[in-house]
């Protein structure tokens, strides 16, 4: 099933399961001060034969998806990289933390600091393992079930402006196809999840290209799935809209290494969407 249909059904489920709580104004409290309603433990799955999962019932700002993912892959944690590419989605989190974000995703993906004092490039390592598996798929590979990248470095959590909401994630190689599963501890269903789906789907395509594999399936595990009180009307509006066919993703076929991708090497094709629905991010 198209992942957008699954996403909209999850929105409806949360509204239905929490109908009485919403009517009585009984919100689940959290660190932001903006109450939520939600559910726990859900899964979304997508096969890219149906298109690239950029939601169509509201406009996805794909430029920010690209900028943030390239920022992570560059191992950067500063705002300058994002601002140069017109992306300001991390500004509020930085403002709460004295203008700095700390050792968040990019640091952990590309320079995880171990207890032994060494740094580990998880992205380079996992791509190398995938290439080895793809080169000799009949040979048992010791790391075939260990293709995991994690941003959740317990020793660094207190220094982060925001501990990772999404990740770890795991790749899987089967029959010449590369699959990806993502685990998300905290899922802002209206603002965050559509962005996260597109970001990790893009990462899957990029890694598949540089490892010479076809793109397989995408699985997204959502734990604490919630809708903020101030975004309920936006969700209701989105649910009145009929989805369009999903767009396609174009990657520059000349790019063969993960660090070579630029903004211009990544484009959405035939992206037909409804107008944006604005909402205030709770931080």
From Swiss-Prot:
Its EC number is 2.1.1.45. Pfam families: Thymidylat_synt (PF00303). SUPFAM superfamilies: Thymidylate synthase/dCMP hydroxymethylase (SSF55831). It is found in: Cytoplasm. It catalyses: dUMP + (6R)-5,10-methylene-5,6,7,8-tetrahydrofolate = 7,8-dihydrofolate + dTMP. One of its GO terms (cellular component) is cytosol. PANTHER family: THYMIDYLATE SYNTHASE, THYMIDYLATE SYNTHASE 1. This is Thymidylate synthase.
């Amino acid at each position: 099933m198209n992942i957008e249909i699954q996403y909209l059904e999850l929105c409806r489920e949360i509204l239905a399961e929490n109908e009485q709580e919403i009517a009585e104004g009984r919100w689940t409290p959290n660190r932001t001060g903006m109450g939520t309603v939600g559910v726990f433990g859900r899964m979304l799955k997508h096969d890219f034969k149906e298109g690239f999962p950029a939601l169509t019932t509201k406009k996805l700002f794909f430029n920010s998806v690209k900028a943030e993912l390239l920022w992570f892959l560059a191992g950067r944690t500063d705002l300058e990289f994002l601002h140069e590419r017109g992306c300001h989605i991390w500004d509020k989190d930085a403002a709460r933390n004295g203008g700095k974000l700390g050792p968040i995703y990019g640091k952990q993906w590309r320079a995880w600091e171990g207890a032994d004092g060494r740094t580990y490039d998880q992205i380079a390592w996992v791509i190398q393992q995938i290439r080895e598996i793809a080169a000799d798929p009949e040979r048992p590979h010791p790391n075939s079930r260990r293709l995991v990248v994690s941003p959740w470095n317990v020793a660094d959590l207190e220094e982060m402006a925001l501990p990772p909401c999404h990740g770890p994630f795991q790749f899987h190689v089967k029959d010449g196809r590369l699959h990806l599963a993502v685990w998300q501890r905290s899922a802002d269903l209206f603002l965050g999840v559509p962005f996260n789906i597109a970001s990790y789907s893009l990462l899957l395509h990029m890694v598949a290209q540089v490892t010479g594999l076809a793109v397989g399936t995408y699985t997204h595990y959502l734990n604490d799935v919630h809708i903020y009180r101030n975004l309920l009307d936006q969700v209701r509006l989105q649910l009145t809209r009929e989805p369009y066919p999903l767009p396609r993703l174009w990657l520059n076929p000349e790019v063969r290494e993960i660090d070579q991708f630029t903004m211009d090497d990544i484009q959405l094709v035939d992206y037909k969407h409804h107008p944006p629905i604005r909402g205030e991010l709770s931080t």
